[in-house]
Regions:
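Hinge/lid segment of periplasmic solute-binding proteins
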Residues: 83-134, 188-191, 274-278, 342-347
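Conserved N-terminal structural module of periplasmic/extracytoplasmic solute-binding proteins
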Residues: 1-88, 103-106, 151, 262, ...
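Extracytoplasmic/periplasmic substrate-binding proteins
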Residues: 191, 222-304
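Long, aromatic- and glycine/proline-rich binding clefts that accommodate carbohydrate-like moieties
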Residues: 275, 326-373, 377, 384
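Conserved C-terminal helix/tail region of periplasmic/extracytoplasmic solute-binding proteins
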Residues: 145-146, 151, 359-408
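A structural signal for short loop-to-beta-strand junctions that line the ligand-binding cleft
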Residues: 69, 76-77, 105-143, 286-287, ...
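Extracytoplasmic/periplasmic solute-binding protein
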Residues: 126-130, 135, 159-211, 255
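Glycine-centered hinge/linker elements that transmit conformational signals in sensory
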Residues: 164-169, 207-238
Length: 408
């Protein structure tokens, strides 16, 4: 696939423009992003000559589907992917180079910087943010009141988060102070890495070739979560949580405060839980977030590159980011739109949106195998750091993750 970009021009037909009827653009996405992708497409189709048709695939099947299409030189006109895959797909030439087009956008300096970085390879731009999901603290205001905590005053440090969790846990019964995905590499990186960043630490070098998990900052963050589990403040199910029941635990109304995805706000509220939102902090302050979500680029084999770019550029506009994303209670991909007419009606959304400019998206070509795969060296590191020999796990993890990052 690394040579795909070199052959794409020969394989793709000229952009015919589709005459008066316009062209029909194919857009692929994973199921997790389907609703937002279709909302973009519906709004675009209502006001443009060209049309965008969205096809979604099951999350677990999507990477293989893209690999197969790339091998057959039959990629869709546009496709989105989990942003942590962006460096890999950019390096393999699956997306067309949009460097010059992106540089000409008036809003280029206001597009989520960590997403732009993720879609960059060897100084060239290949993808833009399509959706943004942020890690935040989600807390149960009713349990805060019962525990004697101020529901309008969330924790401002990670140590304070632990104190609040302990106070809620003291309510007893079915109530637990906190919850986390202790058997899920992606869950842990999404929720705990921001505390490392807020404390001035890092997890990877800038090029994604060397792990730096064996650091004082990482050790301290793991130690805090480990203590909450050992004290029984974190729900017992945290140890084996691999992701599928994570949301359900927070929807139960029996968890005081926990880090999680900002997109869960509505889903938790739908169960009758009064939810507060706060930034994830370092042990003694600061704040950061894992800027997740999906990146989107133009399929390298498209015959409609101009039309595809017109849609991709439109998704960065006020019309799309306020009229589609913010209206649907999503996080705008533009840093200057954190406060908008829809978010201002709910201060929690402004809190989340403002983190886009402060957060990070990890950059590594071999990220999935190194961190997200169930067999990844990162998950082994997590298990050891939380429930085993922490010092040994972090030391071994540094070496094993670095080796994995440099493969391929």
């Amino acid at each position: 696939m690394a040579v795909l970009a070199l052959t794409a021009a020969a394989c793709a037909a000229p952009d015919a423009g589709g005459g008066d009827e316009g062209v029909v653009l194919t857009l692929w996405t994973r199921a997790a992003t389907e609703a937002v992708s279709k909302a973009y497409a519906d709004a675009y189709n209502a006001t443009h000559r060209d049309r965008v048709e969205v096809t979604a695939y099951p999350n677990e099947e999507y990477p293989a589907k893209l690999a197969s299409a790339a091998g057959a030189k039959a990629l869709p006109d546009l496709f989105a992917a989990d942003v942590v895959f962006a460096p890999q797909y950019a390096s393999q030439g699956l997306w067309a180079d949009v460097t010059d087009r992106f540089a000409a956008l008036d809003v280029k300096d206001r597009v989520a910087p960590s997403h732009v970085r993720a879609g960059t390879w060897e100084g060239r731009n290949f993808a833009l943010p399509h959706t943004v999901d942020l890690s935040v603290l989600l807390y149960n205001k009713d349990l805060y009141r019962k525990a004697g905590l101020d529901p309008e005053r969330p924790p401002r440090t990670l140590r304070e988060y632990a104190e609040h969790a302990r106070k809620v846990d003291a309510l007893g019964g079915d109530v637990h102070g906190t919850y986390f995905g202790g058997n899920c590499g992606g869950c842990v990186e999404f929720t705990m890495w921001p505390s490392v960043w807020a404390d001035g630490g890092d997890v990877l070098d800038a090029e994604g070739q060397e792990a730096t998990v064996d650091s004082p900052e990482m050790a301290d963050v793991f130690a805090l979560y480990r203590s909450l589990y050992e004290e029984g403040v974190a729900a017992p199910a945290s140890k084996d949580e691999a992701g599928p029941t994570w949301l359900g635990a927070l929807q139960s109304g029996n968890v005081g405060i926990a880090p999680g995805p900002s997109v869960w706000l509505d889903a938790i509220e739908a169960k009758g839980v009064d939810v507060g939102v706060a930034p994830i902090s370092g042990l003694d302050g600061g704040e950061s977030t894992f800027v997740g979500g999906d990146a989107m680029g133009i399929g390298a084999t498209t015959g409609h590159e101009d039309a595809a770019w017109e849609f991709l550029a439109w998704t960065t506009s006020d019309e799309a980011q306020v009229g589609v994303v913010a209206k649907g209670k999503g996080v705008p991909t533009r840093t200057d739109l954190a406060e908008n007419e829809h978010a201002e009606a709910d201060p929690r959304l402004v809190t989340a949106n403002s983190l886009v400019a402060k957060g990070r998206t990890p950059y590594a070509r071999n990220f999935n195998a190194s961190f997200n795969d169930p067999q990844s060296p990162w998950l082994r590191t997590v298990r050891g750091a939380l429930f085993g020999d922490a010092a040994l796990a972090l030391a071994d993890g540094d070496e094993a993750i670095t080796k994995s990052l440099r493969q391929g």
